[in-house]
Amino acid sequence: MAPRPPTAAPQESVTFKDVSVDFTQEEWYHVDPAQRSLYRDVMLENYSHLVSLGYQVSKPEVIFKLEQGEEPWISEGEIQRPFYPDWKTRPEVKSSHLQQDVSEVSHCTHDLLHATLEDSWDVSSQLDRQQENWKRHLGSEASTQKKIITPQENFEQNKFGENSRLNTNLVTQLNIPARIRPSECETLGSNLGHNADLLNENNILAKKKPYKCDKCRKAFIHRSSLTKHEKTHKGEGAFPNGTDQGIYPGKKHHECTDCGKTFLWKTQLTEHQRIHTGEKPFECNVCGKAFRHSSSLGQHENAHTGEKPYQCSLCGKAFQRSSSLVQHQRIHTGEKPYRCNLCGRSFRHGTSLTQHEVTHSGEKPFQCKECGKAFSRCSSLVQHERTHTGEKPFECSICGRAFGQSPSLYKHMRIHKRGKPYQSSNYSIDFKHSTSLTQDESTLTEVKSYHCNDCGEDFSHITDFTDHQRIHTAENPYDCEQAFSQQAISHPGEKPYQCNVCGKAFKRSTSFIEHHRIHTGEKPYECNECGEAFSRRSSLTQHERTHTGEKPYECIDCGKAFSQSSSLIQHERTHTGEKPYECNECGRAFRKKTNLHDHQRIHTGEKPYSCKECGKNFSRSSALTKHQRIHTRNKL
């Protein structure tokens, strides 16, 4: 394990290395699950705070791994540690694969040299000892520097005991004066200053992943990560002796009797088995809600205190969790780090990618106990179950009206707040269940900051807003270099993608590809229920609702629900009386465009619907259907 004290130049910005702790693979597998959870919380929160404080910190690989649920250890070659050949390994370290050069140490952590890997590594106590070393070299001035907030200390006291509480001073030195920075270790008497070249690791751009797997095309930032990944294809063990899953010789292999999944730690197996048993031993003292994991309880308790320590530096919005802040900031940056390996679609949230991947597999693990209908998403099942229970958990705090689905409530709130449905600071939304609040927390944070002055429409992302403006203006927002990038459209008003069959032109390549399927007949999107195929993904989504019964679009006036947004728009015109489609010949207006087309045939005399029995022609399909009943009755 390699904690790093601050070593930056006097006026240099803080780097994430200054507040990070690294593990090798061997060290990580000796950290018990509770301490792993603490480590994840601390690392993610420290990174989030550096970003929120305005530091230009590129995202390290360890943060990518933690966000995606991967194990965060890195190879020994990537950990910057001085080497001491005269250091002697403790005799208690019995595992043969550990009898090698483990004499690397980072910045005076002499006490860490004697920590046996046969014992469980205690993250918080190791960090406390590291802090004592730092304070010995840095002096009292270091303790006055600005702090990076760690998880709730009271909760950590209850979880690990007061003496093992993570010391927040560990990561406080953001701008330490040069005169109190250590350059020589008093314990070992060796110069431990970093080589300047080693500090350039952050020059690797977070989004660039140059190392790709030849078999599955998955990309990685570091070659060591690719090497580790390739072993999963070869079936090799993760360790030199060929052992799998980090199981050392002599360690007991804990296997779940329900699903066969294996674990290194008995505590890991115990936590996993709660999925099968439904046990939730950690209960909130305030509301009584129970959780499977103590970390989930700690996050939940923040909701009662109302504390929101994580603030966005761009819009000022505050959050109770660092992960919520990180997700919120992607609204401003447009970042979508979670990419589907099958279709290339990207998402802002890992959960969204997980839900999307189910559409490729066709798996529907969520089944209704009432009618047996199955769904690919838990949220779809929850919405469906309300058709049986009649539950309407989303209540308007202004007029008291309740809705079965959150989108219906958001649309309703526009009546009260004139098109600002997401500004939760201007009004409150009451939820009858705390689970509903949790599910919609990320949705409520979606502020539509970009306003179109021409038509009044609001947008959450600047890319959507820029695309929309092309409708109103021919002004060129791109310079010539940007215009020919893969993702940018050439110039506003231009339609560079032209169909060579019918000549129709499009602004976007995706629209052109979808249109071209009309000519080729290609229908790549197939329904898993009935086998019907579609040329567009959106058409398949709408079709699948005929099987699930899902109707997410609800009329705020009468409560009637629809499976398609276009059907809701047409229905709402029955309340407003709006008839936007007007005949140029006689001035008659209609609510539906199809009704206008049918009407215009009166003027043109066109009769495109022909009876196959007698050859009679009709201007409307409904008239043909009615006529065909005559032939059907005659045959009977």
Swiss-Prot record:
GO cellular component annotations of the record: nucleus
Main subcellular location of this protein, as a coarse class: nucleus
Stated name of the protein: Zinc finger protein 90 homolog
Subcellular location field: Nucleus
Free-text function comment from the UniProt entry: Inhibits the transcriptional repressor activity of REST by inhibiting its binding to DNA, thereby derepressing transcription of REST target genes.
Quaternary structure note: Interacts (via N- and C-termini) with REST (via zinc-finger DNA-binding domain); the interaction inhibits REST repressor activity.
Zinc finger (C2H2-type): 211-233, 254-276, 282-304, 310-332, 338-360, 366-388, 394-416, 450-472, 497-519, 525-547, 553-575, 581-603, 609-631
Tissue and organ distribution: Expressed in heart. Isoform 2: Highly expressed in regulatory T-cells (Treg).
Keywords assigned by UniProt, alphabetized: DNA-binding, Isopeptide bond, Metal-binding, Nucleus, Repeat, Repressor, Transcription, Transcription regulation, Ubl conjugation, Zinc, Zinc-finger
Highest taxon above the source species: Eukaryota
Family named by the database record: Belongs to the krueppel C2H2-type zinc-finger protein family.
GO biological process: positive regulation of DNA-templated transcription; regulation of transcription by RNA polymerase II
Record-annotated disulphide pairs: none
Gene for this chain: ZFP90
Keyword Metal-binding part of the UniProt annotation: yes
PROSITE patterns, per the entry: KRAB, ZINC_FINGER_C2H2_1, ZINC_FINGER_C2H2_2
A GO molecular function held by the record: DNA-binding transcription factor activity, RNA polymerase II-specific
Residues annotated as domain KRAB: 14-85
Cross-link (Glycyl lysine isopeptide (Lys-Gly) (interchain with G-Cter in SUMO2)): K448
